[in-house]
Amino acid sequence: MSSKKKKILLLSDDVRMSSGVATQSKEIVMNTLHKYEWVQIAAAVKHPEQGQIIDLNDAVRNETGIKDAYLKLYPTSGYGNPDILRQVIEIEKPDAILHYTDPRFWLWLYAIEHELRVNIPIFYYNIWDDLPTPYYNTNYYRCSDLLMAISKQTYGINKRILMNYGYEDWQIKYTPHGVDEKHHYKIEDGDTKLRQFETKFGLDKFDFKVLYLNRNIRRKNPGDVVMAYKYFVDQLPPEEQKKCCLIFHTAPVDENGTDLKAVCAAAIPNYNVIFTHNNNEHFQDEEINFIFNSADVYLNMASNEGFGLASLEALMAETPIVVNVTGGLQDQCGFKKEDGTYLTADDYVELGSNHRGKYKEHGEWVKPVFPSNISLQGSPLTPYIFDDRAQFEEVGIAIKYWYDVGPKERKRCGKLGREFAMDKNIGMTAKLLGDNIIDAIDTAFEKWKPREKYTLEVV
């Protein structure tokens, strides 16, 4: 073990789990192991290994070839507490803390931030779904020395809030999600394993397949997906209708969403729908790549979406997308300014969001649908946040566009989508994610100054 490496304590979903937070936590760790040692307080809802210490050094050394790779997990049910954190700090003696996911999960961490920042910095890999600027998050953001914003919209939010508190440019960085291009890629037509996968789920019977791969929860609007698909298929002659299919890779029933089989039975009883998640068995990377390759278009109609990892995975597999213009989904659209250059994170400091359609020119790999209704929602902990609703008829028209252009054009546009995601200036591969994390953290280590033991502030 190299004593020259900085050790970082990661607070997030267990890197071995399958959630979006877990997936990106793993990519961050695996793509920076050559630079840092990692310890994780590894969260799960009811963690079966709570109280154990999991040493993954041999596993990651074998996988990466990095001889001094260091990764140790401290599993916990929930996101931890001050006692667990203090114990792990005492054992591991990290040089910094990196936490990730919604700030409301970290109120206990923010309550002791001053105690911690006297000795080590706190970093935050953060995202916020929508406008208006959440000033109720101000004190949460101020508990971190470095904020890495996952979306351009979040970068703008962080900047607008923290510029009033003396934060310097190095303390706020745009650091988008990244996926491994070796796990998500275009499979050649006729591949035996892909054909076997399609046969297993009955996908081989259809010529045009629309994929929903998301959680079955309200803000993802799976019911609107059904209605958009209906609007699309209703426009086709009967023989062509039979050759189309809607794929749901999600739990068919979820108390946080709906009963999708009941919705489909009522709304599209005569149209083809396939559920690939009936047994709640999570697909491995290879199977996820198969399903993106099998689909002709990927669809995300979420009315609040921090980033939209699955649409990026679709682009990496060279599958065109239809997305609602909200949150981080707009970063995957390749919106351009009047001079032909892409919108940057700094543009979003003033723009806020492109959900009102100020900029319309976009990449050929996507049919963006702008919200037809923007309403202000809220709760006691999040008093206000916009809900961006796309009209399902407009989404149906976007699906019809991809149907009409045919497979050759879809293939061409899908390839452009992968090229966009892999562009080093876009930064949406796993390796580029690691590079961006290293750049931000190394700068923070260089410039960070410990907090004074006591501070006074006018309130």
Predicted features along the sequence, with ranges:
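Nucleotide-activated donor-binding/catalytic signature segment of Leloir-type glycosyltransferases, i.e.
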Residues: G257-E286, F290
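A short helix/loop element that forms part of the nucleotide-sugar donor recognition site in Leloir-type
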Residues: Y185-L203
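C-terminal amphipathic helix plus adjacent low-complexity
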Residues: K360-V459
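Conserved donor-binding/catalytic core segment of Leloir-type glycosyltransferases
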Residues: L10, L203-K220, V226-Y229, L246-I247
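N-terminal subdomain of nucleotide-sugar transferases
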Residues: M1-D58, E92, E457-V459
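Aromatic "clamp/platform" in nucleotide-sugar-dependent glycosyltransferases that forms part
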Residues: S303
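Short hydrophobic beta-strand element within catalytic cores of glycosyltransferases
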Residues: P320-V323, G340-T344
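A short, active-site helix/loop in glycosyltransferases that binds the activated sugar's phosphate group
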Residues: P134-Y174, V179-I187, A262
